[in-house]
């Protein structure tokens, strides 16, 4: 046996090598998705900068590939993961506050809206402390992935049939994605996720007994910390989207926190409680963001509530006499909390039809007409997928989404947009006002409702195609209410906030710039990447750069597919898993094609790839005279072409290159660059990433064309043998 391989972990030779490659590939994707989901929940920086964990995982995996001939010591990633858990999930309140303060430390101005954003400029010392904390967490993520990259690379490099081995790698990755998705579907907590992850990491160690007593105790401490992270909550559940905790309040009311931040309440406005508390009754009668909008509607026969949450908006609709209510909520656990805990039992009413779906997807497909449509304080504290830089509510607050809502209104129907606009982000309220004015050709009725007991405050914007809305709004009673409840910020006819569209859906970004917090964190990643790979990356070999740009282009292609198809099928976790499955299956099909032919000329394939990307960019998909699902299927089929071509190019180049570990490492590091290049969408829009991907692939093609006779990259094991 090669002594170098013996140090690397899993034995890559022998009859069980295929199974070992499958297990290592499964573990790599499983741990990657786990870190993306968990860090985005427990450390808010990783929730707001959605693909940060993904890029760090790629950096660690790629570095491991480059260093597969000199792998890290035993239990290297096991120790890194245990330290990461202990740092991030330590159940000490003061420590949690320090972690939350990291967001404020990195948020150097108000060009990007996050909760707990400071209104004053951030001190340099606070910024440096926050940057150091983020750097430490990123290093632990990278360290966790390094051995996994080394093991996968060494398995591939030892294989006699590289294309078959790569197919096994893809299949293991596919099962890893669905393995974690299954745990999310069952609402299992992180202690289960990490128990499986630690078991996988220990299983792949060459000498498990090296863990020792200290390692075993550390593992138990990690699991204990994960189990202790529930605090004082009545119930803690990990839904497919987020961590949800229920805290009991007074008068049969509850607070629901999402990813450790206050999110929503379950209010009690039953007649019995109002009769017992005259002060509360008077506050309620004076007006609130839930009940007051119904006073502006002429009819309430058919009501749509998107983002119905735990049922407060549904209860308000029932209190105000709605005949039928379609209540749309994306998170089944939040809906379950409302059904179980809401004192008014709104979801049990025969007038209510609950729909578990993405709000935008429902509106695009619905053919119903409504007297009132309410956007029920949708606000995302998390993301559905860290494979793109989208939040789950990104496509809900775009011009096209408001136009979908307008289409669903009856001739005299009323649209209500509620949003909690916080200082210093008045530009968000100005954006809503301006967009609605343009869509309805009339300024909306706008007012602000303060908090009433558990009913949260909100800026309220009311629009209609029918002028009777303004006749009602000018009645003495409603006119006085609007005058007494002005918005707490000025409304400008020319707001400096960019209108959001399906191509630029960044509600929480002020303008077409890369927010300073993103630039700060990207700078940290670039610096870490340079320091870690400068001695391993073969800068002077042309093939290295070819695979680098292939990786950059593919990451953009994959994330573009995830974000674009979310428009047609919804931003649900099932959709994301199906899209990733489709991507991996297309790549496996490309492997089969490469395996059937001895040599494929890559010039025409490169040309076809670039042309197909430009075609997807140019076609007016939203104008096709087809249903939403039909257009989505056509777009998915269109994306399969560049995916297939990209798969053929990579696999054929991989087969010819030699030095599987080195080229795979370069490819993964290119994906890191592609992840950072996603930030360009904040300036140029989502579609523009297709052009960037085409440029990356064109550069890779030119490198191949001009270095056709270049020597193959020397394998990592060959380098080790000659040393």
Each model region followed by its residue ranges:
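Alpha-helical transmembrane segments of multi-pass membrane proteins
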Residues: 1-723
């Amino acid at each position: 046996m090669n002594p170098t391989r013996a140090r690397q972990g899993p034995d890559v030779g022998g009859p069980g090598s295929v199974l070992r490659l499958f297990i290592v590939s499964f573990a790599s994707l499983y741990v990657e998705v786990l870190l993306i989901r968990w860090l985005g929940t427990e450390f808010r920086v990783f929730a707001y900068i959605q693909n940060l964990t993904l890029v760090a995982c790629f950096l660690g995996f790629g570095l491991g590939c480059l260093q597969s001939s000199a792998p890290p010591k035993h239990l290297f990633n096991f120790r890194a993961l245990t330290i990461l858990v202990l740092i991030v999930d330590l159940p000490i309140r003061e420590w949690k506050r320090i972690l939350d303060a990291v967001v404020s430390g990195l948020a150097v101005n108000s060009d990007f809206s996050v909760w707990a954003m400071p209104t004053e400029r951030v001190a340099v010392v606070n910024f440096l402390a926050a940057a150091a904390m983020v750097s430490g967490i990123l290093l632990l993520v990278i360290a966790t992935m390094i051995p996994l990259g080394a093991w996968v690379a060494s398995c591939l490099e030892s294989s006699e049939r590289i294309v078959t081995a790569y197919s096994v790698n893809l299949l293991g990755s596919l099962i890893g994605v669905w393995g974690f998705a299954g745990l999310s579907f069952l609402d299992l907590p992180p202690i289960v996720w990490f128990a499986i992850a630690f078991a996988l990491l220990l299983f792949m160690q060459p000498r498990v007994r090296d863990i020792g007593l200290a390692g075993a105790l550390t593992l138990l401490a990690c699991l204990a910390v994960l189990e202790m992270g529930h605090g004082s909550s009545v119930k803690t559940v990990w839904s497919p989207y987020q961590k949800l905790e229920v805290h009991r309040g007074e008068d049969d009311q509850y607070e629901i926190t999402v990813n450790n931040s206050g999110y929503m309440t379950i209010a009690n406005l039953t007649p019995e409680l109002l009769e017992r508390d005259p002060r509360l009754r008077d506050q309620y009668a004076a007006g609130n963001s839930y009940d007051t909008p119904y006073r502006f509607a002429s009819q309430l026969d058919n009501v749509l509530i998107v983002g119905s949450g735990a049922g407060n908006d549904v209860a308000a609709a029932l209190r105000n006499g709605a005949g039928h209510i379609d209540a749309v909520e994306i998170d089944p656990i939040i809906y379950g909390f409302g059904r179980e805990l809401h004192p008014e039992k709104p979801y049990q009413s025969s007038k209510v039809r609950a729909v578990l779906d993405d709000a935008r997807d429902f509106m695009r497909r619905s053919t119903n007409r409504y007297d009132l449509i309410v956007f029920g304080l949708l606000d995302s504290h998390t993301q559905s997928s860290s494979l793109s830089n989208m939040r789950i509510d990104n496509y809900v607050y775009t011009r096209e989404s408001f136009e979908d809502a307008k289409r669903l209104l009856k001739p005299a129907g009323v649209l209500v947009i509620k949003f909690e606009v916080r200082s210093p982000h008045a530009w968000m309220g100005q954006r809503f006002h301006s967009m609605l004015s343009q869509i309805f050709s009339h300024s909306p009725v706008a007012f602000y409702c303060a908090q009433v007991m558990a009913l949260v405050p909100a800026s309220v914007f009311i629009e209609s195609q029918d002028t009777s809305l303004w006749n009602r709004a000018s009645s003495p009673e409603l006119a006085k209410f609007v005058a007494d409840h002005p918005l707490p910020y000025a409304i400008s006819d020319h707001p400096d906030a960019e209108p959001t569209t399906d191509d630029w859906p960044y509600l929480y970004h002020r303008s077409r710039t890369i927010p300073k917090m993103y630039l700060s964190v990207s700078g940290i990643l670039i610096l870490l990447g340079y320091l870690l790979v400068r001695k391993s990356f073969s800068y002077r070999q042309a093939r290295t750069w070819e695979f680098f740009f292939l990786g950059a282009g593919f990451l953009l292609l994959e994330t573009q597919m995830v974000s674009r198809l979310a428009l047609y099928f919804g931003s649900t976790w099932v959709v994301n898993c199906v899209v990733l499955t489709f991507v991996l299956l297309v790549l496996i099909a490309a492997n089969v094609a490469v395996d059937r032919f001895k040599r494929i000329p890559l010039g025409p394939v490169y040309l076809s790839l670039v042309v197909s990307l430009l075609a997807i960019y140019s076609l007016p998909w939203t104008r096709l005279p087809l249903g939403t699902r039909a257009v989505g299927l056509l777009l998915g089929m269109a994306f399969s072409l560049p995916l297939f071509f990209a798969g053929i190019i990579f696999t054929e180049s991989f087969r010819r290159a030699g030095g599987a570990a080195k080229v795979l490492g370069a490819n993964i590091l290119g994906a890191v660059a592609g992840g950072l290049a996603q930030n360009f969408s904040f300036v140029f829009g989502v579609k523009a990433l297709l052009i960037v991907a085409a440029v990356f692939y064109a550069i890779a093609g030119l490198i191949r064309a001009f270095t056709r006779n270049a020597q193959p990259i020397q394998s990592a094991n060959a380098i080790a043998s000659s040393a």
